């Protein structure tokens, strides 16, 4: 399992006092309020303040004190240690843990690795690109077992839930 998570990317400066504008890589931007420190280029830094602006997060990070300082961090990722990540509810997983998991059906047919997880209003969808593109709705009656430690997910056979075109 990954021990460091990317939670955002610095996309611009904000103001003249070293604040940075962050594009969040998490569904719930309010989780930034709970963060005390982050990693940038592997170096731990304290967060001094968190504000929100439309779909962006504005961070004041210790040691970044001027607009020129902030400019040098553009395009860098904001990361956190897994131990600092918010606790998950039962039967939920971090996307970073799901990506790369091998998916099999209950007949032990290998379907491919999860390339990404797509968030939709009704449910998440596992995206397998190879060997054949497949979109798997993350529903309890389709996804039968998730074993993150073994990077293995078992689903119902596709023929039982996918419409034929």
Curated annotation (Swiss-Prot):
Identify the GO cellular component terms for this protein. Answer: cytoplasm; ribosome
Q: Which InterPro entries match?
A: PRC-brl_dom (IPR027275), PRC_barrel-like_sf (IPR011033), RimM (IPR011961), RimM_N (IPR002676), RimM_N_sf (IPR036976), Transl_B-barrel_sf (IPR009000)
- Kindly list the residue ranges recorded as spanning the membrane: none
The record's listing under Pfam families reads:
PRC (PF05239), RimM (PF01782)
Q: Where is the PRC barrel domain?
A: 89-161
Q: Which SUPFAM superfamilies match?
A: PRC-barrel domain, Translation proteins
Organism's domain of life?
Answer: Bacteria
Compartments, record wording:
Cytoplasm
Q: Does the keyword Chaperone apply?
A: yes
Where does it primarily localize? cytoplasm
MF terms per GO, please? ribosome binding
Question: GO biological process: what's one of them?
Answer: ribosomal small subunit biogenesis
Coiled-coil region = none
Q: Has keyword Chaperone?
A: yes
Q: Which UniProt keywords apply?
A: Chaperone, Cytoplasm, Ribosome biogenesis, rRNA processing
Domain observations: The PRC barrel domain binds ribosomal protein uS19.
Q: What quaternary structure, including any partners, is listed in this protein's UniProt entry?
A: Binds ribosomal protein uS19.
By its UniProt entry, which HAMAP family does this protein fall under? Answer: Ribosome_mat_RimM
Q: What PANTHER family would the database entry show?
A: RIBOSOME MATURATION FACTOR RIMM (PTHR33692:SF1)
Q: What does this protein do?
A: An accessory protein needed during the final step in the assembly of 30S ribosomal subunit, possibly for assembly of the head region. Essential for efficient processing of 16S rRNA. May be needed both before and after RbfA during the maturation of 16S rRNA. It has affinity for free ribosomal 30S subunits but not for 70S ribosomes.
Q: Which family does it belong to?
A: Belongs to the RimM family.
According to UniProt, the name of this protein is Ribosome maturation factor RimM
Q: What is the lineage of its organism?
A: Bacteria, Bacillati, Bacillota, Clostridia, Eubacteriales
